[in-house]
Structure formats: C-alpha cells, structure tokens
A protein has these predicted regions:
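Beta-alpha junction/loop-to-helix N-cap segments that form part of ligand/metal-binding clefts
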Residues: 21-25, 47-54, 62, 66-138, ...
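Extracellular/periplasmic bilobed ligand-binding domains
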Residues: 185-277
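Short, low-complexity disordered leader/linker segments with a strong preference
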Residues: 1-34, 65, 379-380
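Extracellular/periplasmic periplasmic-binding protein-like sensory domains
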Residues: 240-312, 326, 366-379
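Segments of small-molecule ligand-sensing domains
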Residues: 298-308, 319-372
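Extracytoplasmic "Venus flytrap"
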Residues: 32-57, 79-86, 108-109, 173-182, ...
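Hydrophobic alpha-helical segments within soluble ligand-binding/sensing domains
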Residues: 88, 147-170, 182-184, 211-213, ...
Length: 380
C-alpha cells in the first residue's frame, strides 16, 4: 500500500474506532430515520438479546406500516455484541460513526449498557436501554435513559415479598461478574436487614460457572428459609437443580434476569415453586397486553417474554419522542425523551423521572407446571 493510502486508511480507522464524535451532517436521508440497536444476539445471554430485538423489530415494522414517523420510514440497524465484554463499545462506535444513527436502543445486560453509555453520551446520541436495571447506567449522563424499573426498587420488591411470606432468614448467591447481580443482592440485603431480617449466608460465583455445590453446601448449613439467586437464567437453572440434589428444598428468589424459557429447560421440576420479579405477565388480561401477545405470536410463532415487551416499548417511546420533538436533532430529541410522562406501554404506564429512570410497577411470578404464573403486582 502506498503511503498516502496508508495514511488515509489509518485516519478512517481512528475516526471509526476511537473518539467517535458524531458527524455534523444529518443522519439518514430525506426519506428515512436511522436508529441503531445493539443486542446480545449470540453468546451466553442470547435469549435476552433475541427477545428484545424481536420486540424492537415488531415495533419498527408497525410504525413503518402506518407511515413511519414525521413522514419518514425508520431504518433499524442492529449490531450483535455477542454477549461479550468489549464488543458493545466496538459496535456502538460503528453505529454512531459509520451509520450516523440519531438514537440508540440497547442493551438488556447492565454491564454491557455501562460499556456503551459513555460513548453515546460523548457523541450526544440519545440511548434508551430497554432492560438494564442497575442504577449506574443512567448516571453516566443526561443522554442515557431506561424504560425499566431499577434494582433498588426490584430488590425492595423481592425483600418485601420474602417478608410477607414470613421468611426472616435468607441467604444470597451473587454473580460477582455481573453489575446487575451485585446491585440486586445489595439492595435486597439492605431492605431485608433494615426491616428485621437476617442474611445467614452470602456466597458468590462467576458467570459461566457450572458447579455450585460448594456454595450451596455452605448456604444449607445455617438453615435459611429462602435463597436469593440474583444472577441470570444462564446459571440460575443449574443452581436450582443442584440445590434440589443437595436436599435444599426452600424457595429460590430471583430478579428479571431469570426471564427466559431456558430457565425451565435447564432446571426442569427443580424450578417449581420458586419466585422472581419481572416487568409484565402474559396472564395479565388488559387489552394492551393481550393485543401485544396476539401480534407477537402471529409474527414469531412464540410467546413473548418481558424482554420482548420492553424492546417493543423502548422503540415506541423513542418514536413518540421523535414525534413530539418534531425533529431528530439530538438536543431536542433528548429533551422530548426526558419529558416522557404517563406513556401507556405494554409493560405499564411509563413516566421518566429526573434521573431518566422509569417509574412503573413490577410483578411477582412463580413457576408452576413449567410455566411462569402471575402472583401479584407491586407498585412503586
């Protein structure tokens, strides 16, 4: 390669993969609005990313079928971060610099949203996470939003539920590699102990582990009445199965990270009688939820989960904000997203607070006959 060509190539590479300043020229064309999405379509938590993407794609297809937004069709460009650390930063830089997106949707996992959020914030590209519940995500800056509840609320919901069952002695098993799990355990412990409960054992593991017998044996000894397993479905199913093998027959509790068909596929009957908090229930008979389920089934020939519903809501809230802003100019679009109030989504009525977090209810689900069954709704 000749020297001028080499220099040009290096300059281009630096532009795409380094500072990632947003191009000054307007994104898209006169007939389209370009939105980026990053999701874990492959890898360890692919179930989350695939579901979220399906919901997002369904919303975009519906919007385009009805004429688009501001008279323009929406073009969705999706990048797979492969459930890997490091990939979110790479793909988000590409979406901003190469594709010149006007807004960004993603991720489900808090650790991956935390990796991407500083890049979106620096470029002043509004980012909406459908399901990252760790509080630190929106603390990155004023261009970062979420439409799900946060872990301080979710941890409180689980602790209140445990105490409503009369359980005063609990154990905690945390995935130390996931910000989500660490935060959820912390907030559960704070509320549970502040209101008279005792944490009799705290154990940890790392994402990808397969053998949890040592931790479970340590948990069994002080006789807890329930165990919080605050990580993702990828390990929770194995933990449930191994707990039952060790004769631990008390209820396990989890957060929205349990929401995947793979949970029951891995654990089988060992998951029966356990509980987790989530964003919606397919057993809710409200028309908006049943209509969403009907459309999702027709499009994908499967039941939606909460990640699919949150993906749908995130795209619809973004479209609503673009309409209210009357433009895709980043500052005005940011302000319109921040002003979201009483938006009736599939996962509830959504209002964004001053910290750009959604105030909305949670549901408690239990596992019975291999299905997620509704128990109760808990308001903020």
């Amino acid at each position: 390669m000749k020297l001028p060509s080499l220099i040009a190539a290096l300059v281009l590479a630096a532009f795409v993969f380094a500072g990632c300043k947003r191009p000054e020229a307007p994104a898209g064309s006169a007939t389209e609005i370009i939105i980026g999405e990053f999701a874990s379509l492959t890898g360890g938590t692919a179930s989350f990313g695939q579901s979220s993407h399906k919901g997002t794609k369904m919303a975009i297809d519906e919007l385009n079928a009805s004429g688009g937004v501001l008279g323009k069709k929406i073009k969705l460009i999706t990048e797979d971060d492969q459930s890997k650390a490091g990939e979110p930063a790479t793909v988000v830089r590409k979406l901003i610099s190469r594709d010149r997106i006007v807004a960004l949707l993603g991720e489900v996992a808090s650790s991956r949203s935390l990796e991407a959020a500083p890049i979106a914030q620096e470029a002043r590209v509004p980012m909406i996470s459908p399901a990252s519940t760790n509080p630190k995500v929106t603390e990155v800056g004023d261009y970062i939003f979420r439409i799900c509840f946060i872990d301080p609320f979710q941890g409180t919901v689980l602790a209140k539920f445990a105490q409503s069952k009369g359980w005063t002695r609990a154990a905690i098993l945390t995935d130390v590699k996931q910000d989500y799990s660490v935060g959820l355990s912390q907030f559960f412990k704070e509320f549970f102990t502040r209101h008279g409960g005792t944490i009799v054992s705290e154990q940890s593991y790392s994402s990808g582990d397969k053998d949890f017998k040592a931790q479970l044996t340590s948990i069994k000894a002080p006789n807890p009445q329930a165990i919080l397993v605050s990580g993702y479905y990828t390990e929770a199913g194995l933990i449930a199965r191994q707990a039952r093998q060790l004769g631990i027959n008390i209820p396990l509790l989890g957060g929205d990270g349990w929401d995947s068909p793979s949970l029951v596929e891995v654990a089988g009957e060992a998951m029966a009688g356990n509980f987790f908090s989530n964003h919606f229930s397919t057993e809710d008979q409200s028309p908006i939820i049943q209509d969403f389920i009907k459309k999702y089934r027709a499009k994908y020939n499967e039941e939606p989960d909460a990640m699919g519903a949150l993906g749908y809501d995130s795209a619809m809230i973004l479209a609503d904000a673009i309409k209210r802003a009357g433009t895709t100019e980043s500052g005005k679009l940011r302000d319109a997203i921040a002003a979201t109030k009483d938006y009736q989504g599939v996962t509830g009525r959504i209002t964004l607070d001053e910290k750009r977090n959604a105030s909305k209810p949670a549901v408690i689900l239990t596992i019975k006959d291999g299905r997620f069954r509704y128990v109760e709704t808990v308001a903020p």
